[in-house]
Curated annotation (Swiss-Prot):
Pfam families listed in its UniProt record: HATPase_c_3, HSP90
Protein name as catalogued: Chaperone protein HtpG
SMART domains in the cross-refs: HATPase_c
Keywords linked to the UniProt accession: ATP-binding, Chaperone, Cytoplasm, Nucleotide-binding, Stress response
Organism: Mycolicibacterium vanbaalenii (strain DSM 7251 / JCM 13017 / BCRC 16820 / KCTC 9966 / NRRL B-24157 / PYR-1)
Residues covered by region (B): 354-569
Top-level lineage group: Bacteria
Function noted in UniProt: Molecular chaperone. Has ATPase activity.
Gene Ontology CC, one term: cytoplasm
Chief location: cytoplasm
Lineage: Bacteria, Bacillati, Actinomycetota, Actinomycetes, Mycobacteriales
Length: 651
């Protein structure tokens, strides 16, 4: 008996996805079966794990399997499992809506999806392969019962913006544990690549192509016809249940026996992805800790790449028995984009996430996997540069997080990272390449950190470096502000910010001849510097002449060991208290504004108008580096007053 029937609307993002499906933007409609079988396999994995963890769960796990049923007359295809099942709330959460972070980004990407290849990537990125059913079906029914629960749930939709959901009374026990998905198939249409999905041979073909490696048996009832005997009688028809997949663990097979297509399909299964892997990493370890691993570096970044709490895509097996999906103890957070499987031969099965964190074998496996992934990236960098460029574009920002957290592999990470620089507008550089290009006399690796390349190229801090022809790394990712504080050198060359500390780009010979000139210049500006330090005491802790400016009148810098404003903002945004730190104002002694200000101060003293000019000087220096004014209204007022006087002087 059914009760509690509701008709609900799909969430906006879900409606957009359905529209993509129904209007056939996908090039390969056959992949719907892979998605349904993959979901069924996940449900069986979850039930096996839950029965292991929860001894009070009274379920039979002796014959876990997936069934495929077809009805040629009704033109239906059903994929059924006896796995974990779902409650009514879980059905609404997982199917009626997209209960995931990043739905706003999904909405934007759906709007921007102009072609089928772009659209195809969205399914895998947002983990919503169930919707692929609507590529081949006019109507989809789902019937499910959660393991250990008495109530079952029926869900149905034709993909037109609404769905119905009802609770099914289990008094008669008519709904078995698990989930069945029934597709009411669209008419066969070869031009639209809609095949006959009730055909036994088509189902066999798709299971072999997409799901042969699934660890659970995929069964289907098939008819077997026996010809009539020669001495008379009729042809006999029997129905047999066949297992369609080999269930061979792909990671246990030698690499030369596995085709690229098999690796690709396995990657799509474990990663719930639609793109192809950029790199395949197969490894086998023997000795103290025996394990096999099959890892993949994707070719596209997932939407939640920069969410450090996002699920890690490495599954843990022990002796080919699924133990845990998204095992974050197997891969450091900065490699969270890596997908795949690790199969250990000897590990305690009494596992929990807390125990795993303390497991010596898990730590050893993680260390080896990390080194293997980094060595693969290094090989890409040196031997397959096109692949490396793709990798760096997609995952470079997150890989740099390892410079902060993985001290053991920091040197390797420094060598594998790439950075924009003033050397080339298009091609990034490695630190090793930067060092090779350093001219005689340069002993430091110079870098500038900011929000964008354009902002940094116009920063006053770069002026002297441009004049000297020194290359400067342009660091524009938020993580750059953090890792440069903990990495002090590369290949014996110190890293030096162009916006911190004192900069002296002259050679020793030049310095010997310029010391007297410099002292004389400092004496000539001593009064102005002392007055500006007092007038701007609320903003700066020191005023001095600059050796880094050639065109701008002034700039702001931070002490050698001080915290930059951008880093301070990041810390405050994360809730960490950071004291306000005054900075240093450097003046360009050759700029007409500075020499004019010196003469005006000599003749007029510290009048109110000059104080306003000093504030404008500080404000323009702050704006030139992309900073934020403390009192924009006052700055605007002072500027308007100066502009008014300029116009008035010319009338």
């Amino acid at each position: 008996m059914a009760a509690h029937v509701e008709q609900l609307e799909f969430q906006a993002e879900a409606r957009q996805l359905l529209d993509l499906m129904i209007h056939s933007v996908y090039s390969n409609k056959d992949s719907f079966l892979r998605e349904l079988v993959s979901n069924a396999s996940d449900a069986l994995d979850k039930l096996r794990l839950e029965s292991f963890r929860n001894k009070d769960l009274d379920v039979d796990t002796s014959d876990l399997h997936i069934e495929i049923d077809v009805d040629k007359e009704a033109r239906t295809l059903t994929v059924r499992d006896n796995g974990i099942g779902m409650t009514r709330d879980e059905v609404v959460s997982l199917i009626g809506t997209l209960a995931k972070s990043g739905t706003g980004e999904l909405r934007q990407q759906l709007r921007e999806a102009k072609d089928k290849d772009t659209s195809e990537e969205l399914i895998g990125q947002f983990g919503i392969g169930f919707y692929a059913s609507f590529m081949v079906a006019d109507r989809v029914e789902l019937l499910t019962r959660k393991a250990g629960e008495s109530e079952a749930t029926r869900w149905e939709s034709s993909g037109e913006g609404t769905y119905t959901i009802e609770t099914v009374d289990q008094a008669g026990g008519e709904v078995p544990q698990g989930t069945s998905v029934t597709l009411h198939l669209k008419p066969e249409d070869r031009e639209d690549e809609l095949h006959d999905y009730t055909s036994e041979w088509k189902i066999r073909e798709l299971v072999k192509q997409y799901s042969d490696f699934i660890a659970w048996p995929i069964r289907m009832e098939v008819e077997r016809r026996t010809p009539a005997p020669e001495d008379g009688g009729e042809e006999s028809v029997t129905v047999e249940t066949e297992t369609l997949n080999s269930m061979k663990a792909l990671w246990a097979r030698p690499r030369d026996e596995v085709s690229d297509e098999e690796y690709t399909e396995f990657y799509k299964h474990v990663a719930h992805a639609w793109d192809e892997p950029l790199e395949v990493i197969a490894m086998k370890a023997e000795g103290t800790f025996e394990y096999q691993a099959l890892l993949f570096i994707p070719s596209h970044a997932p939407f939640d790449l920069f969410n450090q709490n996002a699920a890690v895509g490495v599954q843990l097996y022990v002796k080919r028995v699924f133990i845990m999906g998204d095992c974050d103890q197997l891969m450091p957070p900065y490699l969270r984009f890596v997908k795949g499987v690790v199969d250990a031969q000897d590990m305690s099965l009494n596992v929990s996430r807390e125990i795993l964190q303390q497991d010596r074998q898990i730590r050893a496996i993680r260390r080896r996997l990390t080194k293997k992934v980094l060595s693969t990236i290094t090989e890409m960098q040196t031997e397959r540069p096109e692949k490396y460029r793709t990798f760096w574009t997609q995952f470079g920002r997150v890989l740099k997080e390892g410079l902060l957290t993985d001290i053991e592999n920091q040197e390797t990470l420094l060598r594998v990272c790439s950075f924009a620089s003033t050397h080339s507008e298009d091609e990034p550089t490695t630190l090793a390449e930067y060092v090779e290009r350093m001219p005689d006399g340069q002993s430091q690796i110079f870098y500038a950190a900011g929000e964008s390349r354009q902002q940094l190229l116009h920063s006053p801090h770069l002026e002297a470096f441009k004049a000297k022809g020194y290359e400067v790394l342009l660091l524009t990712d938020p993580v750059d502000e953090v890792w440069v504080e903990s990495v002090h050198e590369f290949d014996g060359k110190p890293l030096q910010s162009v916006a911190k500390g004192e900069v002296d780009l002259d050679s020793d010979a030049d310095n010997d001849g310029q010391d007297a000139e410099r002292q004389e210049r400092e004496q000539g500006f001593a009064d102005l510097i002392a007055w500006l330090k007092e007038a701007l005491s609320d903003h700066v802790k020191e005023v001095r002449l600059s050796t880094r400016l050639t065109d701008s009148p002034a700039c702001l810098i931070t002490d050698t060991f001080g915290i930059t404003p951008a880093l301070a903002r990041m810390y405050r945004a994360s809730g960490q208290p950071v004291p306000v730190e005054k900075r240093i104002l450097e003046l360009n002694p050759n700029h007409p504004l500075i020499t004019g200000l010196r003469e005006a101060h000599k003749s007029r003293g510290a009048d109110a108008e000059l104080v306003g000019t000093a504030e404008l000087l500080y404000g323009t220096a702050l704006l030139a580096e992309g900073g934020v004014l403390e009192d924009p209204a006052r700055f605007a007022g002072l500027l308007a007053d100066r502009l008014t006087r300029t116009v008035g002087d010319q009338t």
